[in-house]
Amino acid sequence: MQALEPQPPLASLDHEGLVISLGTFSKMLAPGLRVGWLRAPAALMRHLVVAKQATDLHSSSLAQRAISELLTRFDLEAHLATLRATYRDRCHVMADVVTASFPEGTHFECPDGGLFLWVELPRGLDTLALLTTAVTRHRVAYVPGAPFFVDRARSNTLRLNFSNCQPAAIVDGIASLGALFTEALQRELPAAAL
């Protein structure tokens, strides 16, 4: 399977009407566009509509009209192919810079889909503790990995988003993070050796 190759929806395998499919336009059109879609068996749809109405009455009419126009006038498949290629290229740029600039012992895998690189740094680094320095001194943000774990034991992990930045900014930002993590690890090594 190629990276970012679209897979058939799970609902296409459902022959008993048990699968509910939902999605969002935010990843394919605009991150701030909080409009999604839902496909469900008819028996469930009425209940789902009532649940949605109880939550927020309705989604933005303006956003829904804009999406309708886009889907009517533009080739969505061509747009998605361009996005996949763009995201694949940005992911590879980020992976190359992580490999070149992060401390030895860093592990990651390029995703087969999605917009994030999951990174495990050498033990002894705490990405939550380093986040403020990353943002204020290096002007780079990331998501610390510890909150993704029930016991928060993996404080040396982080999630990096490659969807929003141009390749040159990815190179600069990730190299800067690499310098921060390497410097922090060098400070930790003497203490770990005691």
Q: How would you label these PLM feature ranges?
A:
Residues 1-194:
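PLP-dependent class I/II
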